[in-house]
Regions:
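C-terminal regulatory/interaction module of P-loop NTP-utilizing enzymes
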Residues: 1-419
Length: 419
């Protein structure tokens, strides 16, 4: 981009950002270019989700983590699978837990009723008039029988207890608190979208829920005041690999993406961003395994991450023109671009020659894989190769590293079955 273009203000461009360990994510580094930084700022300005397209290993998911760190926002992520349901991103309802609660309450109420019945019988037996003459043997045996009955639950009472437990909440055995304990709201867990939109009401709801089915990847011990302070800063919510699910999942998100909120019928409650709180930055990634519904895509801004795209590489090359004596060539530019990324991730670890050699091997294998219609290695594989080289004791000098690259690169770059 030339100097007349808008320069992002909230995201630092060409800056080495160290990413802290987060949930299951390891430490790492990320570098925003102008295009991705500007896309993030536009998503913030419009309130629209940012759909990030690109091949696997191009840094789509990491972009969301880096954005959260740069914007000082809490990071929430959900990796989509073929079994993920759209509603579960909003809220979870657990009917099994509610049924279990009903059974527990019924058993408790039946046991209370049985204890009351035994107590009344005991009082009746104790209040029997004691005769003025010495008791006869038959009377003694009768009193022993009464004492025996006090200590023993009769078979018909056991049957009465079993029937009460089996009947659940429908037989009138529940105490007064039963109707409140069995409210459907006690079985609803806020999903990740709820936390991202309004973490205060989500914090309240998680305190009400008996058996939460979803927990965000951070400490729930904060107070409502702390939750409100967090809500003012906002969240970054990553929906990772949405193309793993069928079209029902993105279609289930049309309301929340279009309106910025959703309704929970069982609570008769609408979840939306409260006044004064920051709207979430929603970043959605796809590897293009499935086509996304047009109505879903229309609600998103779209960023294409194509690091080997000729137009992108030419733009990057032209910004470096004062430092480059060579004429532009796509493969040569990609090698230089990857070598620069390698230095940003492994600062002062490898020489330029080693980083460029690793990049040349990647570019060669990418071209061969593309011609054969196979999976192409990408930026992630390039960084994995350098990481392995750094950690292998046999590669301490530049010459050793250059020799080892040829040996180990197939383990990283060639992933298809060989005939």
């Amino acid at each position: 981009m030339n100097s007349s273009h808008h320069i992002p203000k909230k995201i630092r461009v060409a800056h080495r950002i160290k990413l802290e360990r987060c949930q299951s994510w390891e430490e790492g580094f990320h570098v925003f270019d102008e295009e991705s930084a500007l896309a993030v700022e536009m998503a913030l300005a419009t309130g629209r989700p940012l759909l990030v397209r690109g091949e696997p290993g191009s840094g789509k998911s990491q972009l969301a983590r880096a954005a959260a760190q740069e914007l000082n926002r809490r990071f929430i992520s959900e990796v989509i699978t073929s079994t993920t349901e759209g509603q579960n991103l909003l809220w979870h309802y657990d009917p099994v837990a509610r049924f279990h609660e009903a059974q527990m309450l019924a058993a408790e109420a039946a046991a209370t009723a049985l204890r009351q019945e035994n107590w009344e019988e005991d009082n009746q037996a104790d209040s029997e008039e004691i005769p003025s003459v010495p008791p006869q043997p038959e009377a003694l045996s009768r009193k022993k029988s009464i004492r025996y009955k006090k200590k023993k639950i009769l078979p018909q009472k056991r049957q009465h207890l079993f029937q009460a437990i089996s009947a659940g909440a429908g037989r009138g055995f529940l105490p007064d608190r039963g109707s409140a304990d069995l409210h459907p709201g006690n079985s609803i867990s806020p999903g990740p979208f709820w936390w991202a939109i309004d973490c205060v009401s989500a914090r309240q709801q998680i305190g009400r829920c008996r058996w939460p089915l979803y927990q965000p990847g951070f400490d729930l011990g904060f107070s409502l005041e702390e939750a409100a302070a967090q809500a003012q800063r906002g969240f970054v919510f990553l929906i990772d690999e949405i193309d793993k699910a069928d079209s029902s999942l993105p279609n289930a998100l049309l309301e929340v993406l279009g309106n910025g909120g959703f309704h929970v019928p069982l609570l008769n409650q609408t979840v939306r961003v409260p006044p004064g709180f920051a709207s979430p930055l929603v970043i959605i990634t796809t590897n293009e395994e499935r086509e996304l519904p047009p109505a879903f895509v229309r609600r998103c801004l779209v960023l294409h991450l194509r690091f080997d795209d000729e137009h992108y590489l030419r733009t990057w090359w032209n910004r470096q023109v004062t430092q480059r004596a060579d004429q532009f060539h796509p493969d040569r530019a990609l090698v230089k671009w990857l070598a620069e990324r390698g230095e940003l991730h492994f600062e002062h670890v490898f020489s330029v020659r080693v980083r460029e050699k690793a990049a040349e091997l990647l570019v060669r294998d990418r071209r061969e894989a593309q011609q054969a219609g196979l999976i192409k290695p990408g930026q992630a594989e390039y960084l994995d190769l350098l990481r392995a080289l750094r950690n292998m004791a046999a590669a301490s000098s530049e010459q050793q590293q250059l020799a080892l690259l040829e040996q180990i690169s197939p383990y990283v770059f060639i992933k298809e079955a060989q005939e």
